[in-house]
């Protein structure tokens, strides 16, 4: 037995451990209702209550709004329980019936408008008896709990005790038997609201993305002063015993060192840290950023604080070192577009999950898996979360990282590779070969473009490749504008928007292709990464289709979609679109605020996106807009006239403003000016109309953490894939000849997977005239937009969503 065990390699042991974890502790999701027809009043006469508990997080208000309005639309009576479990115990004015207007204009607010608290009394039986009394007296038997694992565990304990609690209340005449009979059991659906992202079973928790944005904006600000004085900064971030925020912030900010609980530092961490910082300075870097999770520890379980790190750097290297503890600023401020959208989607799904439950149903949590709304068992998720805590208590760090999920593992692996200064001669993917690889940007600039190039360059250097950047797109390629990269050349690229390589929209033509081929041959380019929008995708098709004529194009090629329009087939999300939606939401928030004090004003906001309505739809949903006009959903003058009636009816009941988002090419005749003129004419003295054309500001300044990290990880994945193809298509005389369709691919997110799709296969899914994919997942969100905004809608969806039965992969980019 011992002899057999000794033959197992660490890799095999790792595989066995992962397989066992998946087998015995897998969390099996159930498909949600998103994208299906939503009929009004289908749950008429039913009652539910919403409460937020534990620490607050940005995006909770979005969830409260979504649950309230979807439930009212479906015919339910909705109660809001103020101050969490404390309010449930106190009763009285702490439990109020909600109306449609109760949750108006809250989607952009941080925190939670219904308050949150940590209740010690609810942990006692008497506290739970009081809470049960208040719920029974109001006929509440369905609860939506928005909080962390502690709040959700408490809710489940309450559910399990319900029968005994009710019997005791009836026996002691605290409630009537008739009232108790109406609520024989309670059902619970959870939404995880936590900035820590420490809950197993969901890829993202509500508030995490906003916290990351706050952290990254703070680090970006610190970088400027650190460079000026050649300082080292130690940044402490929240997260309790989960290192997610610290790890992802380190990736997005290009931090030099990161301390997290799941990957403890060795005993000699002071020497390792100082050697790394010294090495970075010797490469010409003027500053150092070190990120410390508040729960950071060493291998012995001893805490590592920001002050410990500062002392080590100051004593050993004599650097001017400062500590910045971000604290509760990470919880504050307006929620990001991602968290607003997540709250909307999860909240709507929670209503359907709750209403479809029976007495035998187990409580569930609404989760996002890849880009799909699913329902997962609450108890299984809590159990898995507790397993992480146990693994860390047992100092089983490998298991702790595995239990955090594939995304966490991928983040950690990528961070380790991208922060290495010395590349390995052996055990790399090149396997002794010296490949020449190149990267080019094509199309309009977008957030995350530089992050992708940085990641590709450093991963290529790590794997012993010579890597070139091609400047100014195909014009630069034709002119031989090549730059050979060193490791330090791409320092601080991730935090910057635009394109440092330069990018243009021109495509390869019959006239330029001989020049392109000649330059590829001259520099012996053996693999090419294209980072860009629809032009990058179209260019790859052109190059692949001309391989017979130009052998120089017979190399592995890969496209990473990077465009704010999100109009490239083969992926659900493009790099840059998250940055753009956040920019739009921030501007809409200011536009809405400008109406404060004025009466009856209608705003028309025009977004970019070409013919694609992605930006218009998602920014409308994320900002609480009333409608979005897009090309994919044709509209007529009659539709606009009907909207005027909606505007008038809303203003008659107290609304002071109405906001419409219009995609720039939604209709060639019904232009933004036309819509304004029609509204002005029909509205007459009832309201005034103003137009805001947002323009190129939507391309963003600093990329969001989402776009930085998605660009980083997609480029790393693309380089690995290209190296595999290089080795597969290498001839005996060390030439690369790649002719198959599978060597010209697009790397995208499809449902819950990251997929390489041959670009020639995507042609049939493409409307080249309008530069659109034939199927767009986000059209499934259009019904939700109308329900949450109008309170009257007949909706149906033809959007196609991916099956949740597919095996999960590292499709989420955080």
Curated annotation (Swiss-Prot):
Query: What Enzyme Commission number(s) apply to this enzyme?
Result: 2.7.1.11
InterPro entries recorded: 6-Pfructokinase_euk, ATP_PFK, Phosphofructokinase_CS, Phosphofructokinase_dom, PKF_sf
**Cofactor(s) needed:** Mg(2+)
Please tell me which top-level EC class this enzyme sits in: transferase
Question: What does the entry list as the binding residues for Mg(2+)?
Answer: 149
Entry's NCBIfam families? 6PF1K_euk (TIGR02478)
Q: What is this protein called?
A: ATP-dependent 6-phosphofructokinase 1
């Amino acid at each position: 037995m011992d002899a057999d065990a000794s033959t197992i390699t660490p890799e095999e042991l790792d595989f066995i451990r992962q397989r066992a974890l998946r087998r015995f502790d897998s969390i099996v999701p159930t498909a949600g209702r998103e994208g299906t027809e939503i009929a009004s009043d289908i749950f008429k006469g039913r009652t539910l209550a919403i409460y937020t508990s534990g620490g607050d997080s940005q995006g909770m208000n979005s969830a409260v709004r979504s649950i309230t309005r979807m439930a009212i639309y479906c015919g339910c009576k909705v109660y809001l329980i103020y101050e969490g479990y404390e309010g449930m115990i106190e009763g009285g004015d702490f439990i109020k019936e909600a109306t449609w207007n109760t949750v108006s204009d809250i989607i952009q607010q941080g925190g939670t408008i219904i308050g949150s608290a940590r209740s010690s009394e609810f942990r006692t039986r008497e506290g739970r008896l009081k809470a049960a009394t208040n719920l029974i007296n109001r006929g509440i038997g369905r609860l939506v709990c928005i909080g962390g694992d502690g709040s959700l565990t408490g809710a489940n304990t309450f559910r399990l005790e319900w029968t005994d609690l009710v019997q005791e209340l009836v026996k002691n005449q605290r409630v009537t038997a008739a009232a108790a009979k109406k609520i024989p059991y309670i059902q619970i659906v959870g939404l995880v609201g936590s900035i820590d992202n420490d809950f197993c079973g969901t890829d993202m928790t509500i508030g995490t993305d906003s916290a990351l944005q706050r952290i990254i904006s703070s680090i970006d600000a610190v970088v400027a002063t650190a460079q000026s004085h050649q300082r080292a900064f130690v940044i402490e971030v929240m997260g309790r015993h989960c290192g997610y925020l610290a790890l992802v912030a380190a990736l997005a900010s290009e931090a030099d060192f990161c301390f997290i609980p799941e990957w403890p530092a060795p005993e000699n961490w002071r020497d390792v840290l100082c050697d790394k910082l010294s090495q970075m300075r010797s490469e010409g870097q003027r500053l150092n950023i070190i990120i410390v999770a508040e729960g950071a520890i060493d291998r012995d379980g001893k805490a590592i604080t920001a002050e410990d790190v500062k002392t080590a750097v100051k004593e050993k290297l004599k650097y001017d070192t400062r500590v910045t503890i971000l604290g509760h600023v990470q919880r504050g401020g307006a929620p990001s577009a991602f968290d607003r959208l997540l709250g909307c989607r999860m909240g709507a799904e929670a209503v359907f999950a709750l209403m479809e439950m029976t007495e035998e149903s187990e409580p569930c949590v609404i989760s996002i898996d890849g880009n799909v709304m699913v329902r997962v068992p609450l108890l299984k998720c809590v159990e898995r979360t507790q397993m992480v805590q146990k693994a860390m208590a047992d100092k089983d760090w490998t298991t702790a990282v595995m239990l955090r999920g594939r995304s966490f593992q991928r983040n950690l692996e990528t961070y380790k590779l991208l922060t290495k200064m010395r590349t390995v001669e052996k055990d790399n993917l090149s396997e002794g070969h010296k490949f020449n690889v190149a990267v080019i940007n094509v199309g309009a600039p977008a957030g995350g473009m530089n992050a992708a190039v940085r990641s590709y360059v450093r991963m290529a250097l790590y794997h012993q490749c010579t890597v070139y950047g091609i400047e100014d797109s195909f014009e630069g390629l034709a002119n031989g504008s090549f730059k050979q990269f060193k490791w330090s050349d791409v320092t601080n690229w991730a935090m910057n928007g635009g394109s440092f390589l330069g990018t243009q929209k021109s495509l390869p033509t019959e006239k330029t292709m001989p020049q392109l081929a000649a330059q590829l041959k001259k520099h012996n380019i053996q693999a090419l990464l294209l980072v860009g929008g629809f032009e990058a995708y179209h260019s790859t098709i052109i190059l692949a289709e001309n391989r017979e004529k130009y052998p120089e194009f017979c190399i592995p090629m890969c496209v990473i979609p990077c465009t704010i329009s999100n109009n490239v087939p083969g992926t659900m999300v493009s790099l840059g679109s998250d940055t753009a939606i956040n920019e739009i939401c921030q501007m809409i928030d200011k536009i809405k605020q400008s109406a404060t004090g004025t009466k009856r004003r209608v705003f028309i906001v025009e977004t970019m996106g070409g013919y694609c309505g992605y930006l218009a739809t998602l920014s409308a949903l994320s900002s609480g807009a009333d409608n979005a006009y897009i090309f994919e959903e044709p509209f007529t003058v009659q539709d606009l006239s009907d909207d005027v009636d909606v505007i008038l009816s809303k203003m008659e009941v107290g609304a002071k403003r109405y906001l419409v988002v219009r995609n720039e090419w939604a209709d060639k005749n019904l232009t933004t000016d036309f819509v304004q003129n029609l509204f002005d004419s029909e509205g007459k003295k009832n309201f005034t109309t103003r137009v805001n054309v947002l323009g190129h500001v939507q391309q963003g300044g600093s990329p969001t953490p989402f776009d930085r990290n998605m660009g980083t990880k997609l480029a790393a994945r693309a380089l690995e894939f290209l190296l595999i193809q290089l080795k597969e298509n290498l001839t005996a005389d060390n030439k690369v000849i790649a002719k198959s369709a599978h060597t010209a691919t697009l790397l995208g997110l499809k449902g819950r997977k990251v997929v390489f799709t041959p670009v020639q296969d995507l042609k049939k899914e493409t409307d080249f005239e309008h530069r659109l994919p034939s199927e767009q997942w986000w059209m499934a969100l259009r019904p939700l937009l109308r329900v949450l905004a109008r309170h009257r809608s007949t909706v149906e969806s033809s959007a196609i969503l991916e099956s949740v039965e597919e095996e999960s992969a590292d499709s989420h980019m955080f």
